[in-house]
Amino acid sequence: MKGIVFTEFLDLVESKFGLETVQQIIDQSELESNGVYTSVGTYKFTEMVSLLTNLSNVTKIAPNDLLKVYGLHFFDALVKNYGSILKTYKGPIELLSSIEGHIHVQVRKLYPDAELPQFETLEQTDDKIVLIYRSSRSLYPFAQGLMEKSFEHYGQNCEIQHELLKDDGSEVRFEILKK
């Protein structure tokens, strides 16, 4: 997992819960990296699971709720670091329909070893998009946060419904309606 995912996660934890909580979850997680991340490094997914689990235990907030908030936060990091890519899209539905065919292609150019989820567009109109999310990491709430924030970025509102196609969350159907 790319380091930017870790650095932004710890930034979010610090901004929402304080530096002491960051240190607490790092200490509790017994990380191979010792909690030292660079945005361009690559780290084990198990470290993120451990950090997330310990944050959930400390805050008493469900992991999926934390992941969704993190997705909302991470979109801002994408705007800051890769805003030029987002400017090529007129709106969130166009952006979301281009994840697999354009955005992930660009990510792979920058980070050839990145392990990205797959997004399949099943249906797309001016006001609706239906996507299938696939990832062995089952981070669909994170993806939902990113989707939600993409609408906000373009000054639009949306309603997102999801259906687990696999119980472990590795395959999820998202239906997103522009409001």
Segment roles from a protein language model:
Residues 4-12, 50-54:
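A general alpha-helix detector
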Residues 11, 130-133, 147:
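Short cationic amphipathic helices and targeting signals
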Residues 12-19:
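Short basic helix-loop element that most often maps to the first helix and adjoining turn
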Residues 20-58:
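Long amphipathic alpha-helical segments
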Residues 141-155:
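Short, non-transmembrane amphipathic alpha-helical segments
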